[in-house]
Amino acid sequence: MSLAGDVARDFRRDGAVRLRGALVPQMVDLLRSGIDENLARPSPRAKTASRPDDPGRFVEDFCCWDENPAYRRFIFESGLGQVAAELMGSPTARLYHDHMLTKEAGTLQPTPWHQDQPYYNVEGRQNVSFWVPVDPVSRAASLEFVAGSHLGPWLMPRSFMDAQAKWFPEGSLADLPDIEADRAAWPILGWALEPGDVVAFHMLTLHSAAGADRRRRVFSVRFLGEDATHAPRAWPTSPDFPGLEAELPAGAPMDHPLFPVVWPAAS
């Protein structure tokens, strides 16, 4: 799978692009089966990210690719590794982690505006996340982005339900602006999506999502380019990689079995 040149240009400019019809139906079916298996047998890392009184439910799970055969096949056979390398401008695309996000119909819990990279244990500019729905997603329930925000500074990561600074110390990074207070002032991107569509975004692009008007099963897979290095934190990252610092020192390339190279494919 290869991209038209203007797609990579738009990604570099806006920090988010839609890849319409990027996946063949067989890959969507494979991924859907993997998500359903994951929901039926969640890993110890799974969590409910909605409040107990929410009429729906928001479930997340992380780092399941080595335990879920459908996820593994999807990551290595879907062609997204090559797309990642092209978007990043990197000769290689290395898996960082997978992330399953399912909002059941009627879920009220929004995903507040945030950047992803401040929650992580990596430094570097070459990165991309793919947001892959296996159900139709309305524009109102889809992920949305502030175009160009990936070119700005890191902003304070906070917990989604109580806005606590559980990662970087309070005051060490600037807080996010109140985008919802004046949405018209911001260049917001978002798209209605069908199974087979993929959204690609940079880990520093500000993004959010509303609740779900119908069931919304999504798989997100995140890739790192050649400039990515390990950045151990003094706090648990999200997701966390316990013990990794003993094997991968600060500043080292992310060359570790947890993060295999997906593109180019091994011969």
Kindly label every feature range from the protein language model.
Residues 1-13, 20-113, 119-121, 236:
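Non-heme Fe(II)-dependent double-stranded beta-helix
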Residues 104, 138, 152, 207, ...:
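Feature marks short, surface-exposed loop/turn motifs that line or immediately flank catalytic pockets
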